[in-house]
């Protein structure tokens, strides 16, 4: 090796491990409007300073690796690196802190939730220097939001398609979710829709099993929709689950649903994947189908307090990827704090502009500009006696999704649907008359019982 080569190597590159904070911890950094901002809850290994761990998260989720590499000199690290720009303690948790990281927009492919998550959470969660890591929130800049189509139609267009205004929509998941033949399944759909529901729903794990192949289910459910519409004069729908083992089979099911002229299909967006979901969302926009989203598998990701990802992040990702409805759980019977957190991400689904509000778990102000909103679906163990609370908490722009609360009626499926519809209309009427649903809810439902099975 010549002396000249040795000199260049010595000046331009020095191998070895160095502290992340020397490069990736930048408390003086002023965030840009185009940066994607992330709030991580970090639980480090003992003895590691917060600045080093916050910088490690920024490095390992952007341009960094465990050592200096000679190709660092071939690019502009300052332009592309993630930066940990702020660290704050978690109240009541001595060993945890929130690390705020800013990512330059050029790190991400336009219109790809898949790439965004691969970059931000794809690798760093296995980092052994951390005991636990949780992504609490993301700020998606307007410049990146505008690269996404978002929901196929959104709240207002859905109401126009259904010609239903001024109240929450009503749905029911058909039970038992597995084991029914296609014909008996279609019968239950018809009875619920005829009784007064707006939608019925495939359960998330109803795909195309030996006891009920997807094409048979689609045909019998379409027949139930046609018949109930003719008898009630209302537009009805059934969430036909298009989720499949391949994207090709998923699209085949969506195409068949369009040929049947039904209004809505369904997708399990976490198990199906964001690439598949975005593909289906684009098809639904182009072909006039509404898209209902189920969040099956979400608790694997969001249930642990210290590790994983909060559902508000998954909700934001869904709004970008595309869906007209998504299950948001229900706050009935929950603690007040949980209610505030839930309604925080419900607002992130529906509203155009949401201010930072840490009391509701919103770490960043989020501007969705022209991206359509998503209807939150309140489900899980609800029945008619919850209707006053649900109407008050979720408001008109929501779907109230029953199951046993409809099908468990002692007189049958249709009377159960009638009871749901009568209870909802009684609550909406009482609210519009100025009555206090929280205080008078029980009385309102008892009055409605006179006109309901």
UniProtKB/Swiss-Prot annotation:
MF (Gene Ontology): magnesium ion binding; monooxygenase activity; ribulose-bisphosphate carboxylase activity
Propeptide residues, chain positions: 1-2
Main localization (coarse): plastid
Intracellular or extracellular location(s): Plastid, Chloroplast
Modified residues (N6-carboxylysine): 201
Example GO BP: reductive pentose-phosphate cycle
Superkingdom to which the source organism belongs: Eukaryota
EC number from the UniProt entry: 4.1.1.39
UniProt: substrate binding residues: 123, 173, 177, 295, 327, 379
Database matches in SUPFAM superfamilies: RuBisCo, C-terminal domain (SSF51649), RuBisCO, large subunit, small (N-terminal) domain (SSF54966)
Site feature Transition state stabilizer, where: 334
Job of this protein: RuBisCO catalyzes two reactions: the carboxylation of D-ribulose 1,5-bisphosphate, the primary event in carbon dioxide fixation, as well as the oxidative fragmentation of the pentose substrate in the photorespiration process. Both reactions occur simultaneously and in competition at the same active site.
Other information: The basic functional RuBisCO is composed of a large chain homodimer in a 'head-to-tail' conformation. In form I RuBisCO this homodimer is arranged in a barrel-like tetramer with the small subunits forming a tetrameric 'cap' on each end of the 'barrel'.
UniProt-listed NCBIfam families: PRK04208.1
Protein name stated in the entry: Ribulose bisphosphate carboxylase large chain
Source organism of the structure: Sherardia arvensis (Blue field-madder)
